[in-house]
Amino acid sequence: MPAGRAHGPRPRAALAARRPIARLGLPHREASNSFLAMPSPDHAAADAVAKESRLADWFRAHGSALIGFSGGVDSAYLACVALDTLGAAHTLAVIGRSASYPAAQWARAREVADRFGVPVLEVDTDEMNDPRYAANPVNRCYFCKSELWGRLAPIAAARGLAVVVDGTNADDLGDHRPGAQAARERGVHSPLAELGFTKDEIRARSAARGIPTWDQPSSPCLSSRLPYGTAVTSLRLRRVEEAEAALRALGIEGNLRVRYFGDLAKVELDPGPRT
């Protein structure tokens, strides 16, 4: 299971209801003009730079860190700032691998780590064999994250790393996130959320740093493609992963979900023209 965000199926209406957020001059991303009192691009960019400076100070204050690393936008940015601030000897990014973690996302995580020299450790997680997780209840993510942080916290302690951190950001705080409880129980920190980083700010600072994940679509775990109450099995997750990979091979970009409904699949895409 990746350490980045994990969600159950989210209706399109809920996605459409998200309020517009000022874009920070990101390439190929349009700014919303839904609000009359938007901060100027220069002001918004300066605010993001100031937050990054405070993030570096946060890492310095702790001295060392283990990052739960999925290869998504948030954890990739977090790992790169930690590395720049603390150095390789005091930074470790850990990838939790299981059937719910797409191979394509693992490849992106390794690409970022290799490009920037982030020390990486991979561990296998065993949530698939937990009947509470496999039953796919509405708090499924709690059992996944309990397994993940239960494996990462001892690694941090054994290596003398002061804190374990995840990539939760300020925009995540209003979401349904049962995994956040598991993180709190294990003493996991969320510095991006603590410092008020929005997703757009993280994308902007990632672009400025040349981190290739800056415009990457969100990628919840594969189990989120199954309706709550539908048992999570390795076979079902593999079918979803293969279907999404086949669609990507056709040139589909942006957000993509293949929702599993037994003999039926529903495909969710970003709106826009198709070729």
Positions of predicted regions on the chain:
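ATP-dependent adenylation/nucleotidyltransferase module used to activate substrates
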Residues: 33-208, 249, 265
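AMP-forming adenylation/ATP pyrophosphatase catalytic core
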Residues: 35, 147, 177-275
